[in-house]
C-alpha cells in the first residue's frame, strides 16, 4: 500500500473534513471521540495535524481523493488532542507511526483517553505511556478519563527509534 504522510500546520483546516469523517466513523462504531463538529474543527485548527493517506492511483498524494488512514492532532506542548486510525487499518502500525512522529517533535507527550476505551488505553500503555491519574466527569457526557504521559525520555527515544527502522 502506498502511504503518504502530510502535515497540516496550526491555523489551517486543510483535510479537516476527511478527519471529521474518520472521527465520526469511529464514533458510530465504538462510541468514542464524541466531540461536536465546532469543538473538533476549532481544536484541529489550533493543532499541528499529522495525517496518513493510502494513495489512490492517479490522485495527488495526500489529497482529499486519497483515503485517510489516520491522524494525530497535537498542541505545541505535545498534548495529543486526537488520535484516530481507520478501524480497517488497525494493527498495521499506523498509530505507532503517528505517535513516534509526535514523540520525535516533543520533549513531553501527553493525552487523555476515555476510561472505558480499553483498546486505546492498551495501545498507549503498549507504546510506553503511563497512566498518571483518573479524572471523573472529564467529558461533556460525564464520562471519566485517564491522563496519560509517555514515559521518561528513554522511552520516548526508544519509541522514536523503533519507528524509524
Predicted ranges, named:
Residues 6-90, 96-101, 159-165:
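Acetyl-CoA-dependent GNAT
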Residues 14, 118-119:
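Short alpha-helical
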Residues 69-70, 133-136:
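A structural microfeature
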Residues 79, 84, 110-112, 147:
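Conserved beta-strand segments that form the floor/walls of ligand-binding pockets within enzyme
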Residues 97-110, 123-126, 130:
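Conserved acyl-CoA
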Residues 104-117, 135:
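Conserved GNAT acetyl-CoA-binding A-motif
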Residues 114-118, 137-165:
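C-terminal "cap" of GNAT-fold acetyltransferases
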